[in-house]
Structure formats: C-alpha cells, structure tokens
C-alpha cells in the first residue's frame, strides 16, 4: 500500500507557489492531520520546518532528531495536496514536539 502521511510525520514536500512571508521551496513539514483524513480527502494539514531559527514565539524546536533539524513554524499552517506535491516521509517527531506545536497553534486560533 502507498504511503499516507500521518499526524507527527515529517514529510519532504514542495511548498511552492508561495506569496509574501510564507515559507517556500522544497522543505520538510510536520503533518498535523490524521492518516484517516489525509487518505480520504487527499489533502493534509501541515506546518513548515525551517533551519533558520529566529526565536519567534511560535517556533517549536524539533530537538534531538537524527533525520530532521530546525524548528516547526506552528503559525504557518498549510492545507496541501500531498499526492500532487509528492510528499515523502522523512521521519517522525516526538509526542512532546507534536503537543507543543498543537498548543501553539491553538493559541494562534483562540487568541
């Protein structure tokens, strides 16, 4: 069976086209949505990951992960067609990183 991105996976994906201050290019992203949603709909919710750490309040450090480094940009949620963008699994984050990302996203949404 073909790969379906799941919550907590880090995927390598092309974020172009982009506009303004959005992250762009071919880069890792943290999958937020579940495999059941992603497989059924063909889309996934994700946050880009960058190695350009700027200590912004919505950055979440990946920590000690041999496959990916940098920070998750929890305030830059994207809904992407993971099939059309050929998402490839790069690794998985810890539950602590996933929880912190979701908590920061909740702060963005709820204010």
Q: Model-found features: residue ranges?
A:
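Conserved functional hotspots at enzyme active or ligand-binding sites that engage polyanionic ligands
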Residues: 1-111
């Amino acid at each position: 069976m073909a790969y379906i991105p799941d919550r907590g996976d880090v995927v390598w994906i092309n974020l172009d086209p982009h506009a303004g201050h959005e992250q762009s290019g071919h880069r890792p992203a943290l999958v937020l949505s579940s495999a059941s949603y992603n497989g059924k709909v063909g889309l996934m919710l994700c946050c880009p990951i960058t190695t350009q750490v700027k200590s912004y309040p919505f950055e979440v450090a990946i920590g000690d992960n041999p496959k990916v480094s940098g920070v998750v940009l929890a305030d830059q949620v994207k809904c992407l067609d993971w099939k059309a963008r050929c998402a490839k699994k790069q690794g998985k984050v810890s539950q602590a990183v996933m929880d912190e990302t979701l908590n920061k996203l909740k702060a963005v949404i709820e204010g």
